[in-house]
Curated annotation (Swiss-Prot):
Entry-linked Gene3D superfamilies: 3.40.50.2300
This protein's encoding gene: RR7
Residues in Response regulatory domain copies: 92-205
Recorded family membership: Belongs to the ARR family. Type-A subfamily.
Keyword terms of this UniProt record: Cytokinin signaling pathway, Phosphoprotein, Transcription, Transcription regulation, Two-component regulatory system
Region Disordered, annotated ranges: 53-92
GO biological process: cytokinin-activated signaling pathway; phosphorelay signal transduction system
Protein name per UniProt: Two-component response regulator ORR7
Pfam families the UniProt entry points to: Response_reg (PF00072)
Lineage: Eukaryota, Viridiplantae, Streptophyta, Embryophyta, Tracheophyta
Compositional bias segments (type: Acidic residues): 61-88
Post-translational modification as stated in the protein's UniProt record: Two-component system major event consists of a His-to-Asp phosphorelay between a sensor histidine kinase (HK) and a response regulator (RR). In plants, the His-to-Asp phosphorelay involves an additional intermediate named Histidine-containing phosphotransfer protein (HPt). This multistep phosphorelay consists of a His-Asp-His-Asp sequential transfer of a phosphate group between first a His and an Asp of the HK protein, followed by the transfer to a conserved His of the HPt protein and finally the transfer to an Asp in the receiver domain of the RR protein.
Phenotype upon loss of function: Dwarf, narrow leaf and low tillering phenotypes.
Residues modified to 4-aspartylphosphate: 142
Expression induction: By cytokinin in roots.
Source species of the chain: Oryza sativa subsp. japonica (Rice)
Amino acid sequence: MRVPAAVTGGCGCGVDGGGGCCRGGGKLADWEEGKDDEMKSVVVKGWTRMAQVVPLHDNASAEDDDDDEEDDDEDDDDDDDEDDEEEAAPPYVMAVDDSSVDRAVITALLRRSKYRVTAVDSGKRALEILGSEPNVSMIITDYWMPEMTGYDLLKKIKESSELKQIPVVIMSSENVPTRISRCLEEGAEDFLLKPVRPADISRITSRMLQ
């Protein structure tokens, strides 16, 4: 802050008495009005004194405060978006196969793609779980299994009003065109030939789970 020259001595008003101080409203010789908005010349009982004026509202500070509030709001929105992303669970896939080796393979491929997996060894067990947990994103089932084939499981799922919207993919080690056609006609989304490869998982999940 610029202070007018000679701030000591004189008549006790804080300004040099040698022409710098005036009684009865005299003007300060070294004061250039308008160059320092923080200092103003005020007259109190005939004395001219320097007083610092503190504005109630500083426009620049108010604008800075508004900017800070907007930044805080944007940060809060970003935090909310991050929380939403963290809370969104990955798709839930059920793998059905009576072969423990094939179950392990398909489970590993799905988990490598960041999906949650429940693996069961029969169509009957799959239906039991679906009865209590119908919110499955996709079912991948082997075709040839004892007691209930993958085709039979597919039909039961598509006949259920609660489960029919779940995509079903059939897999088999046998390339039988009539079998494949029958499964697709009954509502299967795809038919994979074993051994299932990572590219197969990527193809079906990108189409059905994104």
